[in-house]
């Protein structure tokens, strides 16, 4: 056979299978386009900061992984549907070598359309994506539509490698099976499946374990360490329940003769048993992808929309100055510098918060705070301990509290009361004179990444003694230990004026302190100065969430489409059989529709259940980013679920029409 004949056959096959190949090529084009655009952002000369480029580089790595998985997965639908066609070619005299040449030409055509189409769209839509990213980051980007040659070459090489691997996989599938097996390759799953009780039970246990971990997670650090394990349990449990659990439930319904031998239940249950065997993995994939979309979009939207709340939590005052290894002369000098700059800019300091403190880290065991300077505890009882002299507390709160030796006032950011009369710092005992319900030092918030316990002591002497006893055991160098053993001076305040004015004042204070107090380790952080870095981080995360969320959504849509097409071809014979045994068209349509509805909406329902179960642990993870506005996260999650459910329903209705065209 000549090369022209192979080419004609390949083109004819692509035309005849356009219902399955066009969506596949569109998915490939989309993957190439998204990869090229993000690659340009990560590597191009485009005015983006190093931090943003780092996030884009990480995102590009994720796109590489998901592109391989999704293209191989969608290809499996294509090759399954074409096995019968290839088997006919084989029986009619085409050797497997000839079939391989034909498939190779098809792969070349598909690859070039996908890669060049994707790169072209990447160049066209790249400018729009840069503008969107610039808007999210709150800075102007000088956009030039240029072809990034290194990115183009990398994109071409990467996706060409994927298509070569897919071709080799398809050729292997054809090579290892006989012509008869090829003819019946798309009819797999017609035998009634056996009940795999062990897999169903293991799936239920794994899912329950994942849910339990999500519900019992303590503080955010605890959530960080356990979240991955919970995700693995839920993913494996989902596959187990879809593959074995669904069939087990249906078989139980089948054994219930009173329920099963009703006309509307008989056909539905029988049909569902067969459907679940061939659809279980695909439905589990839809469920997991849907869960990923819902969580990714809702969390990144929440972080971006709630950015002002996050900044307020991270920086309670507009400007915060800390001096380590402080002394009275340095404190006076720093305070004078701050006052001069504020007066110079015609503004005024408000809500001032000035005090000295010593800081420790430990964990609470009963009424004993066990301190260790070289460990950062991540269990539910971990806490940061801040020791403050009584004089500073009285000045800050405008009170006149008194304390005897060995007495303390206690304030915790946790809403739960300490409720004991004594507290030990290692082996040093203190009597709790009063536990404070509120304080200007901080606010009650259970979602802080690390709970803070404030202890107000009679004066600086017991504080310095505790610091010395604790940090003498530290393995850190002498200079670091000396800094930790000393008191820290903290001065924070708000200002009147515009954001630009506040930013200038903060920058001037930072510059003046570095120039005029160089001998002291001094840090200055400002709400307005750090706002740009917040926009970069959360804007980039929001862009990544929406970008990857869109990709996962498109893959979900594609899987639903292929499922509907596969269901249509599989149900074509069933449709005729049900009519031949006496059911009219309306009854047949109603029976099949009920099965299809159950099949395709089960993943959405399970995804929503997964999100609800993960809600608590996700709020703990968001607290790591200082996002403690739970109401906002609830609103973002509900809005995301509603939008996704609407899109899911629209996709189902559109693909359902194609299903009925095939069946009829």
Annotated model-derived regions:
Residues 19-45, 51-87, 107-121, 201, ...:
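Hydrophobic alpha-helical transmembrane segments of multi-pass inner-membrane transport and secretion
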Residues 3-5, 176-190, 569, 660-664:
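Short cytosolic juxtamembrane segments of multi-pass membrane proteins
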Residues 310-324, 329-554:
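Basic-flanked hydrophobic alpha-helices used for secretion and membrane insertion
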Residues 228, 232-252, 309-335, 624-663:
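Alpha-helical transmembrane segments and their immediate juxtamembrane interface regions
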Residues 1-32, 192-197, 206, 242-290, ...:
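N-terminal Sec/SRP start-transfer signal
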Residues 40-50, 119-152, 208-226, 603-664:
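Short helix-loop junctions at transmembrane helix boundaries
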Residues 109-253:
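Hydrophobic alpha-helical segments
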């Amino acid at each position: 056979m000549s090369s022209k004949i192979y080419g004609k056959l390949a083109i004819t096959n692509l035309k005849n299978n356009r219902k399955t190949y066009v969506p596949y090529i569109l998915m490939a084009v989309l993957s190439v386009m998204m990869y090229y655009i993000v690659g340009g952002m990560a590597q191009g000369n485009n005015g983006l900061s190093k931090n943003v480029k780092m996030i884009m580089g990480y995102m590009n790595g994720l796109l590489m992984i998901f592109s391989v998985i999704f293209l191989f997965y969608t290809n499996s639908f294509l090759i399954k549907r074409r096995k019968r066609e290839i088997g006919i070619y084989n029986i009619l005299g085409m050797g497997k070598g000839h079939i391989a040449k034909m498939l190779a030409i098809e792969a070349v055509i598909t690859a070039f359309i996908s890669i060049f189409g994707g790169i072209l769209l990447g160049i066209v839509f790249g400018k729009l994506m840069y503008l969107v990213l610039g808007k999210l980051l709150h800075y102007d980007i000088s956009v030039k539509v240029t072809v990034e040659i290194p990115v183009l070459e990398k994109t071409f090489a990467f996706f060409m490698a994927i298509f070569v691997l897919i071709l080799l996989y398809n050729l292997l599938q054809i090579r290892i099976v006989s012509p008869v097996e090829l003819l019946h390759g798309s009819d797999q799953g017609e035998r009634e499946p056996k009940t795999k009780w062990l897999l169903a039970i293991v799936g239920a246990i794994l899912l329950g374990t994942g849910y339990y971990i999500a519900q019992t997670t303590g503080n955010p650090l605890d959530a960080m360490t356990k979240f991955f394990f919970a995700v693995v349990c839920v993913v494996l449990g989902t596959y187990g329940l879809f593959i074995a659990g669904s069939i087990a439930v249906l078989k139980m319904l089948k054994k219930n003769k009173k329920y099963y031998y009703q006309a509307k239940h008989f056909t539905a249950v029988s049909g569902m048993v067969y459907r679940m065997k061939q659809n279980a993995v695909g439905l589990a994939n839809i469920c997991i992808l849907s869960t990923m979309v819902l969580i990714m979009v809702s969390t990144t939207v929440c972080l971006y929309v709630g950015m002002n709340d996050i900044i307020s939590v991270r920086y309670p005052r507009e400007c915060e100055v800390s001096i380590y290894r402080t002394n009275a002369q340095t404190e006076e000098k720093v305070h004078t510098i701050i006052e001069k700059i504020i007066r110079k800019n015609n503004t005024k300091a408000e809500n001032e918060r000035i005090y000295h403190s010593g800081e420790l880290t430990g964990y609470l065991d009963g009424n004993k705070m066990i301190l260790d300077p070289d460990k950062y505890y991540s269990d539910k009882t971990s806490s940061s301990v801040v020791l403050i002299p009584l004089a500073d507390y009285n000045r800050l709160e405008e009170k006149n509290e008194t304390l005897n030796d060995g007495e303390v006032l206690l304030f915790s950011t946790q809403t739960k009361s300490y409720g004991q009369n004594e507290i030990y710092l290692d082996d040093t005992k203190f009597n709790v004179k009063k536990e404070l319900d509120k304080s200007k030092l901080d606010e009650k918030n259970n979602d802080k990444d690390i709970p803070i316990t404030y202890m107000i002591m009679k004066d600086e002497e017991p504080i310095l003694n505790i610091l010395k006893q604790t940090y003498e055991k530290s393995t850190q160098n002498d200079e670091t230990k000396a800094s930790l053993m000393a008191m820290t001076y903290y001065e924070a305040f708000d200002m009147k004026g515009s954001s630009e004015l506040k930013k200038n004042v903060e920058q001037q204070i930072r510059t003046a302190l570095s120039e005029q107090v160089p001998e002291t380790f001094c840090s200055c952080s400002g709400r307005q100065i750090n706002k740009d870095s917040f926009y970069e981080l959360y804007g980039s995360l929001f862009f990544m969430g929406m970008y990857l969320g869109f990709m996962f959504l498109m893959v979900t849509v594609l899987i639903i489409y292929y499922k509907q097409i596969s269901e249509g071809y599989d149900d074509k014979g069933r449709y005729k059989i049900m009519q031949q045994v006496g059911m009219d068209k309306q009854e047949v349509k109603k029976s099949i529709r009920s099965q299809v509805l159950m099949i395709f909406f089960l993943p959405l329902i399970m995804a929503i259940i997964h999100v609800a179960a993960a809600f608590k642990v996700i709020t703990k993870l968001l607290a790591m980013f200082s996002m403690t506005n739970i109401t906002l996260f609830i609103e973002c999650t509900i809005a995301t679920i509603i939008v996704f459910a609407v899109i899911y329903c629209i996709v189902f209705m559109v693909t359902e029409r194609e299903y009925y065209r095939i069946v009829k």
